[in-house]
Each structure stands twice: as structure tokens, then as C-alpha cells.
Design a protein with these regions (language model features):
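Short phosphate-binding loop-to-helix
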Residues: 52-117
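Short beta-strand segments
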Residues: 8, 97-98, 127
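N-terminal glycine-rich phosphate-binding loop and ensuing alpha1 helix
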Residues: 2-50
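Short glycine-enriched loop/turn motifs at secondary-structure junctions
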Residues: 15, 64, 130-134
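Short, high-confidence coil segments that cap the C-terminus of an alpha-helix
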Residues: 43, 91, 118-122
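Conserved core of the sugar-phosphate nucleotidyltransferase
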Residues: 104-142
């Protein structure tokens, strides 16, 4: 089963504005996340879902320079952005990734995607209860 990965990222963080493009070990945070996610074998595509706010224009240009698709939606309604992006992609199921998770584990994502092949499951997650470190969340949503 192949599913898309939707990476949620925007520049308007209240705790650390602009963090998506802040450099971590010499490259922007969002690039580190994209690089980790791109190692996952059973993805159909990678899309970065950001807001339609002008504040995210710079982020959009950067992501497009990496040849990664971008979806723009509601700034403060992540659920709406997720549903709209899935609809835009024409999918019922997707991998949800936080854009500030540079330590996401590709192998863990692959295991989650394999479990997500069960049509009776609407959510696969390793955060209920949290047993993995923050920043390594896996969520496959239907």
C-alpha cells in the first residue's frame, strides 16, 4: 500500500516564528524533515501543507525549489487543512508529519503504513499513550 505523506509546516509559530527555515546542522529544519521522510519506501508522494497566509510565501518558494509539492490552506485550522489537502490529493488515507520533527524515523513510518493497510483502522499512531520521544510521532489517518 502506498500513501502520501503530508508534512504540516508554517512560518507563524507563536513560540519560534520562522522555525521551518531556521538552520539545524547547516540546513533548514523543513529540509531535514523532507529528507527523512523521503527515505520511506511506501509513499506515493510528499506534500507540504502550509497556510495561505502571506507570511508563508517564503516557505512555499523554498519548498518548491526542492521540487516538493505544496498545498495551501487555512492558517489556524489544521484539521481543515488536512482534510482539504487529502481531498486535493484524492486520497482517504495519509501519513501526517509535523514539520518540526527532524528526528522522524523512516522505518517506524514504514511499519505504521503497513499497519494502515487494515481497512478496519482509521488511525495508526504511536502517541496514545506517548512511548516514543517527542518529534518521532507516527500518524496514519483515514
Amino acid at each position: 500500500m502506498k500513501v502520501p505523506a503530508i508534512i504540516f509546516s508554517r512560518m507563524g509559530s507563536s513560540r519560534l516564528p520562522g522555525k521551518a527555515l531556521r538552520h539545524i546542522a547547516g540546513e533548514p529544519l523543513i529540509k531535514r524533515v523532507i529528507n527523512r521522510v523521503s527515505k520511506v519506501k511506501n509513499l506515493s508522494t510528499i506534500v507540504v501543507a502550509t497556510s495561505n497566509s502571506k507570511a508563508d510565501d517564503r516557505l512555499v518558494r523554498y519548498i518548491q525549489s526542492l521540487n516538493i509539492d505544496v498545498f495551501r490552506g487555512a492558517a489556524h485550522d489544521v484539521l481543515n487543512r488536512a482534510v482539504s489537502c487529502a481531498s486535493y490529493l484524492g486520497v482517504e488515507k495519509f501519513v501526517r508529519i509535523n514539520g518540526d520533527s527532524p528526528f522522524i524515523d523512516p522505518e517506524l513510518l514504514e511499519k505504521g503504513i503497513e499497519l494502515g493497510g487494515d481497512p478496519n483502522l482509521d488511525l495508526i499512531s504511536n502517541v496514545f499513550p506517548r512511548t516514543y520521544p517527542v518529534g518521532t510521532s507516527v500518524e496514519i489517518i483515514k
